[in-house]
Amino acid sequence: MTGKITVNLPHSHDLREQNVLTHMPDGETISTVAEAMKLLGDPSRLRIFWILCHCEECVLNIADMTGMSSPAVSHHLRLLKSGGLIESRRSGKEMYYRAAETELAQALHRASEQVAKISCPDAPIPEDAHTPQNQEVSL
């Protein structure tokens, strides 16, 4: 953030507030982070993203794994791809999807794993949960 922010808070306890405001990301950065998190705010998209963090899959298999229709899966995949969280490749007539190999996608995957672990400590989480396999699937 550029520039110095000076603010008179109703309850000024010490210089912490000024330090926090000086290091706070700008509005555009906050909006970018919020948009990325909003993408995973839908349980279906989070489920699809989680699957794709662990393996590469086609629409039909994702639909079967999630109990969703192929058109619904395709809709969610478009949103995740436009948000930069997943990527795709074509093999013949089939499109395969996987988590993007970006810091953002990896960070959101780790965050979702941690929240699941904290919220549902008895839920099984695969040992390789933090290592995307991105395996090719032959049909």
Role assignments for model-derived ranges:
Residues 64, 75, 81-82:
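Alpha-helical residues within the helix-turn-helix
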Residues 7, 71-72:
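A composition/secondary-structure signal for short, hydrophobic, low-basic-content segments
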